[in-house]
């Protein structure tokens, strides 16, 4: 009886890299569309707390028909999950649109109300353009610094977002700690009589 956590997100946002990092295994992390074609589930332990982590097929706007079957197994994992980690490639120019695609897909699956957290990945790749002081044109999204983005999203989502680089292992300790807290909270609600939760820390 373990809490099930699913990594969801647009294709090519770094879900498999995060999976490898958390489970210290080598899921197929490759920079291309649909490198993960079936759902990989692993047992992960953080501070003696075990849970199941599923890496799922990336969502996209229009799914090619030959991938629909692979996608169905992903959807089952998503439906069964207790917690969704929505991974976003913050360095992608259209990341906000990708967030919408994923959220709409989750909505279509009836999973919009599940506990979830947005994980902004690839902060090491994020780039922005500083405006010249005498440039009076309105700032565009290319002019937003990472700190400004963080403030905006933190204000919008409170504690429900993290900014990491799975590849460069930036902010990974805090990421693990946040997952631990969320999984533990869900575990206490779902399986209140599990002994290992009450061991002396």
Label every PLM stretch briefly.
Residues 56-57, 63, 90-91, 122-123:
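Conserved Walker B
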Residues 53, 87, 119:
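Generic enzyme active-site microenvironment
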Residues 67-92, 104-111, 165:
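Inter-motif core of Ras-like GTPase G domains
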Residues 1-13, 19-20, 24, 93, ...:
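C-terminal-of-GTPase-core extension/linker across diverse P-loop GTPases
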Residues 1-79, 83:
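Conserved G1/Walker A P-loop phosphate-binding module
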Residues 67, 97-98:
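Residues at alpha-helix caps and immediate loop-helix transition turns in enzyme cores, especially N-
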